[in-house]
A protein has these predicted regions:
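Short beta-strand edge/turn micro-motifs at domain boundaries
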Residues: 129-152
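Flexible low-complexity loop/turn motifs enriched in small/helix-breaking residues
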Residues: 1-128, 148-153
Length: 153
């Protein structure tokens, strides 16, 4: 029987932290790419990556996992999880508080290759979407590459 991702909060938080870090930093070395606030959709969505998904699967990100992600990223940004992603988009299409909105795909069960779709949005001309390949164990995970389409505007 496969273990569900939500059965191991360390694993889920480690994977999500690695993906969020890679999505936000994107390999930049000459400036700090972190926004003051990072809003994260509290619902994982299979449509988070750059590839169209016919049947969208959603799964709430458990509170314990949310807390661990917030703690792991606290040195870089203030993390706030939101139930309604549209609630942080201002009328001019920017994200509230000079922030960024991140949407993540669900973590696959243990024993499978970990590919996580993720997208960030900071305004009409500030979107990134990618599928990350993540490797590790327990709470120690790192992005080892990407696969498929990388979308940016």
């Amino acid at each position: 029987m496969e273990r569900r991702a939500e059965d191991d909060p360390d694993r889920s938080a480690g994977i999500y932290t690695a993906v969020i870090s890679a999505l936000i930093t994107g390999g930049y070395a000459n400036f700090d790419p972190w926004r003051p606030v990072t809003y994260i959709d509290a619902t994982a969505r299979s449509s988070a990556g750059p590839v169209a998904v016919k049947d969208v699967v959603t799964s709430p990100i458990p509170i314990e996992v949310q807390h661990r992600i917030g703690e792991a990223l606290a040195a870089h940004t203030e993390v706030r999880f939101v139930d309604d992603p549209q609630s942080v988009i201002q009328p001019d299409s920017r994200v509230r508080d000079h922030g960024v909105l991140v949407t993540l795909a669900p973590v696959p069960p243990a024993g499978r290759l970990v590919r996580i779709g993720a997208r960030s949005y900071s305004g009409n001309l500030g979107r990134n979407s990618c599928t990350f390949i993540v490797y590790g164990t327990g709470a120690q995970w790192q992005v080892t590459g990407t696969t498929g389409i990388y979308s940016m505007s």
